[in-house]
Design a protein with these regions (language model features):
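Short, aromatic/basic amphipathic alpha-helical patches
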Residues: 78-79, 97-109
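Structural signature of tandem-repeat unit edges
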Residues: 1-6, 12-26, 36-49, 58-74, ...
Length: 115
């Protein structure tokens, strides 16, 4: 498996902390839409794309952890819309500036933290 398909976990209220497995290269549109119990997500190196509204309305997430990635994944529109005000998007410190300036990541720049 190299992708998480569209809508696969949409409205899954039992997910809390998840680690996306190594080898996953893409996350489909609305894959985790409205997962209201989700509190953290860790992404593997090699992730290349995140689909439209993939994590929209996941309103209890404390952080998204991209620190294992060596490159910035392509982000589709509204992927993280509805982020809690205190939610962090954790990225490698060496890529923080580039991440904040990357296409479709700029709207989340206030949440991006280099670690």
């Amino acid at each position: 498996m190299i992708s998480i398909q569209e809508n696969v976990f949409e409205n899954c209220f039992s997910l809390s902390d998840i680690t996306i497995p190594n080898g996953i290269q893409s996350i489909g549109s609305r894959a985790f839409l409205n997962c209201i119990s989700l509190s953290s997500v860790t992404f593997p190196n090699g992730l290349a794309t995140i689909g439209t509204a993939a994590f929209i309305l996941c309103e209890k997430v404390i952080y998204y952890d991209f620190t294992q990635l060596s490159s910035i994944p392509t982000l589709s529109n509204q992927a993280f819309d509805g982020l809690p005000a205190d939610c962090e998007i954790r990225v490698p410190a060496s890529l923080e500036t580039q991440w904040k300036a990357a296409t479709n990541w700029t709207i989340y720049a206030d949440h991006i933290v280099g670690v």
